[in-house]
Amino acid sequence: MPAMKIALAVAFFALVATAALAAGMDTAAIASAEPSKKALSKEKSTPAGVRLQVQLDRAHFSPGEIDGKFGENAQKALRAYAEARQLPASDEVTDEVWKALQADARPPTTTYAITDKDIAGPFLRKLPARMEDMKDIPKLGYTSAREELAEKFHMSEQLLTALNPGRHFDRAGETITVVDTGEGAAPARADRVEIDKVRQTVKLFDKSNALIGFFPASVGSEEKPSPSGTLKVTEIDPNPTYRYNPAYHFKGVHSRKPFKIMPGPNNPVGTMWINLSADGYGIHGTPSPQNISKGQSHGCVRLTNWDAERVAASVAKGTPVVFTEGVYPTAAR
């Protein structure tokens, strides 16, 4: 099939998927939705899924990208929240957990007026697939105002579009509907970070050993495993420049010379780099929030950009980072 036909087919199916998502997805439906077993779905976005994800995100128990699906990341966040509140953990939303989450009674959505800054760009025409092709780009910015706004509010682009039929994301002054994840305040100061290489999760604990934050992650691989044992945070670098070392031997990267990729949200390590006390390893962001915890990394710990920024705000130089290899309970497999 010629490239043009493929592109048109992809665009058509994306349009159909967005239209299907938009059906029944509005502020009133989200605000009134109760996250019962029937109202949640792993495969499709639902108003109840959006409301649940928003409540978890506000509590610093991140479901990753808010897309309205009750997928693995949302389920992991739900179990971690129950653990933190010393409530029975379950893959379903219990009455006790839902009551605790609703202590934050703000509406799950709000309106936002697009600013000149939101549409200023410069935007990339296309994000190169190969790292080598990124090295000559002066800034690894967003590909569109829609992508920028979706990340700003921790949302998938599809959900943002579904909530705003007919709206233009590239017009300053346009008022749009977004999920309300709050002011982005960081969790309390973390005394310890715990990274589970099996479950692909990041947890923050305070001095009393209370669980104060949870984030889904992509952690290592068989080819490029993450470290073991206890490391420490050595540097916190917002908007990092990515430096590729040929000694990494990343699959798909053929350069035999070092090269660097300039900062930006679509930089390979996103908007934040938290350096660890093992050469070449860190906790960082990503250009692909939709893939978090659904694949593996090159050995580092990959989070959504907004979650990497929240972790960075909660740790400091010297904070211990413990790598564990938890085993899934039989029922959770």
What are these regions (language model features)?
Residues 42-76, 118-154:
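Primarily a LysM-type cell-wall glycan-binding module
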Residues 186-286, 317, 329:
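Gly/Pro-biased beta-strand-loop elements
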Residues 306-333:
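N-terminal targeting pre-sequences for secretion and organelle import
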Residues 135-216:
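Secretory/export targeting leaders with adjacent low-complexity proregions
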Residues 19-24:
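Boundary at the C-terminal end of the N-terminal hydrophobic targeting segment
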Residues 7-18:
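Bacterial N-terminal signal peptides
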Residues 72-119, 161-192:
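Extracellular LysM carbohydrate-binding repeats and other cell-envelope/extracellular binding modules
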Residues 47-50, 54, 72-80, 95, ...:
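Solvent-exposed, polar/charged alpha-helical surfaces in well-ordered, non-transmembrane soluble domains
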